[in-house]
């Protein structure tokens, strides 16, 4: 990643935003930032991740993408319309696998992330679809545990983790469909060829709730995802709702995620997402 002249000038500007949010006095992440906040992104070449990268780059963030296949990432970013200049100047690629926990820890340590600068982590990786009866070996829980432990080491706070509509936990006392979702995970997900993906998310969420409250986590729970044109209009956009949309466009989820990670009002929440009236 190379910084051009304009980016160097931006990096020495100090932006100030005063005040805190009403949620537990959590200060905005952009307070006194010396450079555009960095986004360390896991799952950047996936259906959602490519759009998270696109909107984060277009919002002037420096994006650090942890990915197995750098060539694939560059290809999908071209496909979704990211300008070559943004890729050249604002994107840094770290090659690695989410199952390699040492590589995951190194990515967090070596990215030089700073809570004071408003830097964040977004985790939107997941197991691919596959017709299977058993869930298989968990992938996300060990990876997120490694990320969380390393965040504590370096003093970083904010992380957004994408799960799914079937993800639930007894602490989600406002979720009236808890038992129904537990049934879906056990019996219906194999028929939908998403057993591995759903079970991975289902195992991860309780860990986040019970072991990560010292961090500023956000857990998103979108419904069925599809590669469709944006459904956002002048009147409606993807946002927090009581129940999830039946189908959510990857592009809309990517745009929401790239913004939501910086929203302190969402810290320690697990929002369902649907198309709601713009505020």
Predicted regions and their residues:
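Glycine/proline-rich active-site loop of Rossmann-fold NAD(P)-dependent oxidoreductases
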Residues: 169-173, 229-234, 262-269
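Mid/C-terminal beta-alpha module of Rossmann-like enzyme folds, strongest
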Residues: 38, 157, 241-279
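Conserved Rossmann-fold NAD(P)-dependent oxidoreductase catalytic core, especially the SDR/UDP-sugar
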Residues: 45, 70, 132-135, 145-195
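N-terminal Rossmann NAD(P)H-binding glycine-rich loop of SDR-like oxidoreductase domains
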Residues: 40-61
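Conserved beta-loop-beta element that borders a ligand/cofactor-binding pocket
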Residues: 205-228
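NAD(P)H-binding glycine-rich loop region in Rossmannoid oxidoreductase-like domains
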Residues: 71, 75-146, 150
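Conserved glycine-rich Rossmann-like NAD(P)H-binding loop of the short-chain dehydrogenase/reductase
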Residues: 62-71
């Amino acid at each position: 990643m190379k910084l051009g002249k304009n980016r160097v000038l931006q990096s020495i500007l100090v932006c100030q935003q005063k005040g805190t949010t009403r949620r537990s006095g959590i200060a905005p992440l952009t307070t006194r930032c010396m450079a555009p906040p960095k986004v360390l992104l896991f799952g950047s070449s996936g259906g959602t991740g490519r759009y998270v990268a696109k909107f984060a780059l277009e919002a002037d963030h420096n994006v650090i993408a942890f990915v197995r296949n750098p060539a694939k990432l560059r290809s999908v970013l071209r496909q979704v319309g990211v300008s070559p200049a943004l890729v050249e100047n604002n994107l840094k690629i770290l090659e690695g696998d989410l199952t390699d926990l040492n590589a995951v820890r190194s990515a967090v340590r070596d990215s030089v992330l700073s809570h004071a600068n408003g830097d964040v982590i977004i985790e939107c990786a997941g197991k691919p679809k596959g017709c299977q009866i058993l869930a298989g070996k968990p992938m996300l829980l060990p990876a997120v545990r490694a990320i969380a432990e390393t965040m504590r080491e370096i003093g970083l706070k904010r992380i957004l983790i994408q799960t799914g509509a079937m993800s639930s936990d007894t602490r989600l006392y406002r979720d009236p469909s808890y038992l129904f979702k537990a049934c879906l995970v056990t019996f219906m997900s194999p028929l939908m060829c998403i057993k591995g993906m759903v079970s991975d998310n289902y195992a991860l969420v309780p860990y986040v709730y019970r072991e990560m409250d010292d961090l500023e986590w956000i857990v998103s729970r979108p419904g069925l995802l599809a590669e469709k044109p944006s459904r956002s209009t002048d009147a409606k956009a993807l946002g927090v709702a009581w129940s999830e949309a039946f189908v959510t466009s990857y592009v809309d989820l990517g745009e929401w995620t790239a913004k939501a990670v910086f929203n302190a009002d969402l810290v320690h929440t697990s929002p369902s997402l649907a198309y709601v009236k713009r505020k």
